[in-house]
Amino acid sequence: MRQQIIDQWVKGEELKDLSVHIKRDEAARILVRALNKEEKEATLADYQEKANKLGLFNSLSASETISKQDAVKILNNAKNVKNGVGNNEGVKEISVEDFMKNPGNVGYELSPDGNYITFNAAWENRRNVFVKKMNDDSEPVRVSSSTDRDIYASFWKDDNLLYLKDKGGDENYHIYSTTFNGNEEKDLTPYPNVTVGVLSSLQGVKDEILIMMNKEDAKVFDVYKLNLKTGETTHVAKNPGNITSWIADRDGNVRMAVASDGVVGTVLYRDSEKDEFKPFIEMESGDQVMPLGFTKDNKHILAKSNKGRDKVEVVKYDLEGNEEVIMSNSEVDVAGVLYNSEKDKVLYGAYVTDKTHYQFFDEDFEKLFRKIQNKLGVRESELVINDYNKEMTKFIVSVSSDTVFGKYYYYDSTTDEITELATLGSWLNPEELAEMHPISYKSRDGLTINGYLTLPKNKEAKNLPLIVNPHGGPWARDMWGFNPEVQLLANRGYAVLQMNFRSSTGYGKEFLEAGNKQWGLKIQDDITDGVQWVIDQGIADPKRIGIYGASFGGYATLAGITYTPDLYAAAVDYVGISNIFTLLNTIPPYWETARKQYYERIGHPENDKELLTAASPVFHADKIKTPLFVAQGANDPRVNKAESDQIVEALRARGVDVECMVKDNEGHVFQNEENRIEFYNTMLKFLDSHLKK
């Protein structure tokens, strides 16, 4: 009787009898075999797993025996999978709010003694700082009261609680102090139009830290010693105008700096703060030598370097400039390492291929890492050591994946106990989310382009609407992991393509420099070639392709609909560049030391005028015919609001209707929760109206 019922459904006949109960695993076996036309038998557990991935059991109870009511749901889910029609049928539609609201407690950090933790959590719709004593039943105490803007980051200095915050997205971050009861918040750097960064926590020095601040000259950062009780600053190092970064030794003495003429850098060194800086490592064009810090004895320097090689490696220099390679990878750049000053040793390093991988240099630390990994039952690429106390006995770790937003845990190695601290996006069910698949394809000139393809659940990977999502930068990269906007799009039935086009970081010097002066040209070709690859696989419907990106991704969006106007049926430009000339004229003052490098990588406004004119979409708006939605923060210090204004005005002058959203209290991408939710709701409606007709 049960088989007869399924046979009727498979043949498309009306179901005549649903009165017979059927076990979940048996239903999984019959339906999966019918849907996939499988000939070979598998285990019942395998069928259940496939059925879950297909979404056949969505919205069902956990009972092993399926009722008549549940049978109807299963068959409807299976019918939707079989037909592959509609708005991602068989998958529960998850609201924009659930993807884009504040996900919960984030940014956990241990106090230096390991007895307290801080984290950021929502209060009055803004992320604020909370503190909690460990191994204690007391409630967390809110110690900040920001109602206009999320706290950017918080950190400890001995028993001092500090946090960073800007105003309206202007990225002029100030350092604030607060107390354990939150009654005394104070801006320690209350100077107009400055931005501050922390250089050293000055271990062993009470109530003082080293900061970098552009107080004297907006274009460059000097070094100051900041008293956390009084707010008094003492000038430690004056920037002559070409220093891009400073490095303090383990005692807090500023003994190293990186200078640049805008293209070529030089690492400078001095024996003490009384001495003059002298060249230590001379770089050539394309070289990167980024000092990470001094070793315990202050006689060696760890650095990330690609000097004399294609890939970034982690090296150790002695004070004579002799180099020892600590970690390298033949395929990709080394992302970073964890150095422990107590052991005077690099414990492990990370590199990113399709996912994040680790190379260990300390046997005890690897055993600890594997123990935590096994306790949590996760893959290596899903586990991160976030923070630890001085003795490295207490740890904050986090777990995330493509379908898991994230979880924080506290691990005490002295008791071997692990405690869950928070689940991000606890209202999201990983089984309802889409997997992120690493992919690669060849560009038209033979480069291997790596990327990711996320496919909607319960939909056959055939003739799907596709959203192309180029990353920002462009000197950045996409990585495997949880991405709320990608999951939102996949949940609504879209395939999402992300690619690391030439000029992306992580793949070596040659790959990055292949994108020099290629905005709108070979970089854009890499994006177009990725779209064509997905079409050739039969996955994407060539008539239902949209493109959406932020920052440089916004530029790539505008370039896509300008230079390949027949490829895209809808486009969303989020804080994107439309005019390269005005971009270069309005960079933040503290980016001035890198101006020549921008000319090298993007183009010179005078020497490359023809190139930049051809590559700026605003001058070719007459080619644009794709429906466009533009979103912009009014206070954006990186991509000025004028970038959006220009393209909107140019298109409207031709009578083209362009949707536009501007938020006066935002900067480079929207940070405030209500603005994020409004933006993504509007974007979805816009995309659906053009790609789901």
Please annotate each region the language model reported.
Residues 490-500, 659:
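A fold-wide structural signal in alpha/beta-hydrolase
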Residues 87-103, 110-111, 115-117:
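An edge-strand/N-cap motif at the start of beta-rich repeat modules
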Residues 462-472:
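Short beta-strand element of the alpha/beta-hydrolase
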Residues 119-144:
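Beta-propeller domains
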Residues 501-693:
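Active-site-proximal cap/loop segments of hydrolase catalytic domains
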Residues 100-106, 112, 124-129, 145-152, ...:
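Peripheral, non-catalytic segments that deliver or gate enzyme domains
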